[in-house]
């Protein structure tokens, strides 16, 4: 079997609320860390979410 191209990652809130999203990422085309601006319901505002590994 071939190695999977898409991997699951965890996008953790930079507001230190502990909230996170799970997203997919193409590891061949996106080699750098993913950063997205999304809504954090705990902080009740839009903040940056940074990539971390799923344990």
Swiss-Prot record:
GO molecular function: structural constituent of ribosome
Taxonomic superkingdom: Bacteria
Sorted UniProt keywords: Ribonucleoprotein, Ribosomal protein
Annotated GO biological process: translation
Signal peptide as annotated in the record: none
Gene Ontology CC: cytosolic large ribosomal subunit
InterPro entries referenced in this protein's UniProt entry, alphabetically: Ribosomal_bL33, Ribosomal_bL33_sf, Ribosomal_zn-bd
Family: Belongs to the bacterial ribosomal protein bL33 family.
HAMAP family (UniProt xref): Ribosomal_bL33
Name of the protein this chain belongs to: Large ribosomal subunit protein bL33
Organism: Rhodopseudomonas palustris (strain BisB18)
Gene: rpmG
């Amino acid at each position: 079997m071939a190695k999977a191209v898409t991997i699951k990652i965890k996008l953790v809130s930079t507001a230190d609320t502990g909230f996170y999203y799970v997203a997919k990422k193409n590891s061949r085309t996106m080699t750098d860390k993913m950063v997205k601006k999304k809504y954090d319901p705990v902080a009740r505002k839009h903040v940056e979410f940074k990539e971390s590994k799923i344990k």
